[in-house]
Amino acid sequence: MNPPKSAPDAQGLSYRDAGVDIDAGDALIDKIKPFAKKTLRDGVLGGIGGFGALFEVPKKYKEPVLVSGTDGVGTKLKLAFHLNKHDTVGQDLVAMSVNDILVQGAEPLFFLDYFACGKLDVDTAATVVKGIAHGCELSGCALIGGETAEMPGMYPDGEYDLAGFAVGAVEKSKIIDGSTIAEGDVVLGLASSGIHSNGFSLVRKIIERANPDLSADFHGRSLADTLMAPTRIYVKPLLALMQKLPVKGMAHITGGGLVENIPRVLREGLTAELDQNAWPLPPLFKWLQEHGGVADAEMHRVFNCGIGMAVIVSAADADAAIADLTAAGEQVWKIGTVRASREGEAQTVVA
């Protein structure tokens, strides 16, 4: 084959000249293989590197239904870039998807990630993937594959974006869809670990206005670490609870807060009435509200306000559920009850 014609002084171009470093990509794969290996579980067929990842549905399921979820970390990443702190956003990525599929009763089976950047920094990417693997370990699911996309010119130097994909399974007869929720049922609130991964556009605006010292102590750790605390993963304690008593409904408190997520599991004609005095508003949310001048209603629409997962059970099972979850290391409060809706009323009200 004849070489292409070019200007007399032109040098031959390589992919590296175009901004893509194949060697860096290979180095990243070598770094992250041990992290992924720690997440392996029954059902994984083959290792990392195939064109597709293979997973055998566990034989314990008689009529398995697959449940899938996908999400990102949002503009929390902008704060991660500013702080040069990349060790927690991987857990955030996993949590956002596995907590979502958990709500329908699913056991997370496997997870895939997508990491996109303009120029690949191997150490940064490896730190992120290590966090993803840690999140998978906390969830009991396998990090079965992923994609690293180095795309020159698409992202500013030092920045990247993340997407995650979780697949789980639930017995068809045990799908949790909220259909059995009735008047008199109790809404339990499980404590969040902080802001989780929603509302960070407002958080960043408040930081811009208040201009705090992010390295300063804030109730025992730096404000930066408090803001970046990884999203709590509720998978193992709630899967265990489902084996012991009927869980009627669950809501992962993400974008939209309590007032927009709990209605997603309620039948028409039912309202969850929450008592805002039933649980303490954590100091970080008080700080955000004070420095941002954020109204109560807006706080409840944007932030989790200290509740990362809502669980609905019968009144007869509430105390047993609280005891079981507390023994598993969760902080739990009775935060409300389910009643008939009044005309023109929202399906979740905070009083």
Curated annotation (Swiss-Prot):
Q: Name one GO molecular function term.
A: phosphoribosylamine-glycine ligase activity
One GO BP: adenine biosynthetic process
GO cellular-component terms in the record?
cytosol
Quickly give the catalysed reaction: 2-formamido-N(1)-(5-O-phospho-beta-D-ribosyl)acetamidine + ATP = 5-amino-1-(5-phospho-beta-D-ribosyl)imidazole + ADP + phosphate + H(+)
* Keywords on record: ATP-binding, Cytoplasm, Ligase, Nucleotide-binding, Purine biosynthesis
One family from Pfam that matches here is AIRS_C
**According to the lineage, what is the superkingdom?**
Bacteria
| Assigned EC number | 6.3.3.1
Q: Where in the cell is it found?
A: Cytoplasm
Keyword set includes Zinc-finger: no
Task: Give the chief site where it resides.
Answer: cytoplasm
Q: Does the keyword Iron apply?
A: no
Q: Which InterPro entries match?
A: PurM-like_C_dom, PurM-like_C_sf, PurM-like_N, PurM-like_N_sf, PurM_cligase
Q: In which pathway does it act?
A: Purine metabolism; IMP biosynthesis via de novo pathway; 5-amino-1-(5-phospho-D-ribosyl)imidazole from N(2)-formyl-N(1)-(5-phospho-D-ribosyl)glycinamide: step 2/2
- NCBIfam families referenced in this protein's UniProt entry, alphabetically: purM
Homology family: Belongs to the AIR synthase family.
What's the protein name?
Phosphoribosylformylglycinamidine cyclo-ligase
Q: What is the lineage of its organism?
A: Bacteria, Pseudomonadati, Pseudomonadota, Betaproteobacteria, Burkholderiales
